[in-house]
């Protein structure tokens, strides 16, 4: 959110939803977003599983992914749900789950053994894999402001 503010954007808190990363939660959240007077033109899901539900809601609303609304998800590396196999191949971010797991284990063990001073949170780089689910924002007169 700080990065958005630094670029002059305001974040509409009603467009942020935290939930379990399931397809049902993705579906319900997307339904709620799409019912807003000014629905979003792009959505970022925390996982491809959540995006699966978001896709269902978008399709039921009669919108075209990548044209009417862009969709991005995290977790490019889930073997059981490949983003390129979605009806519209899904743009994703990718970061190493193995490296993250190793880092978490190191921090937990270090904390238990009182070895090392670890920050409460860390930022990791993620690779953006662009596919067909993203495109230019639709030309909507109502979305001419800088609120995201």
Where are these regions (language model features)?
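Bacterial carbohydrate/catabolite-sensing allosteric modules
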Residues: 1-148
